[in-house]
Amino acid sequence: MAKKVTGYLKLQVPAGAANPSPPIGPALGQRGLNIMEFCKAFNAQTQKEEKNTPIPVVITIYADRSFTFELKTPPMSFFLKQAAKIQSGSKLPGRDSAGKVTTAQVREIAEKKMKDLNCDSIDSAMRMVEGSARSMGLQVEG
């Protein structure tokens, strides 16, 4: 018989940097989960990633206080900022340009994010990435 799911918890944790301090410790502790068990397992699974890459994680919490977690790909804004070599997006997107990304970079980001997007084709994934780029004040060239 399958375990009874009591809830889900979504966090965004830097790769290889999960520790019991806030925000992870309190979020897991108030649900009665073993904080160190999560931190060790998360850090082990993300050790291949570049340090401080934000990794979204969805934790499934069961009635017996056990849990499983699923790692997602880093946010699209993280990839776009890396591609454009900027620290943050434009404060006035549409008026001020924060930088530029090429169509090749957009395709590469779409291929990385494809498994987390709700689309079937690479073209529709590219349109999603282009929309995110525009909302950050980035120009798409090519």
UniProtKB/Swiss-Prot annotation:
Molecular function via GO: large ribosomal subunit rRNA binding; structural constituent of ribosome
Post-translational modifications: One or more lysine residues are methylated.
Keyword Zinc-finger applies: no
Top-rank lineage group of the source organism: Bacteria
GO BP, sorted A to Z: translation
Family assignment from sequence similarity: Belongs to the universal ribosomal protein uL11 family.
Assembly, per entry: Part of the ribosomal stalk of the 50S ribosomal subunit. Interacts with L10 and the large rRNA to form the base of the stalk. L10 forms an elongated spine to which L12 dimers bind in a sequential fashion forming a multimeric L10(L12)X complex.
Alphabetical list of HAMAP family matching this protein: Ribosomal_uL11
Protein name: Large ribosomal subunit protein uL11
Protein source organism: Rhodopseudomonas palustris (strain BisB5)
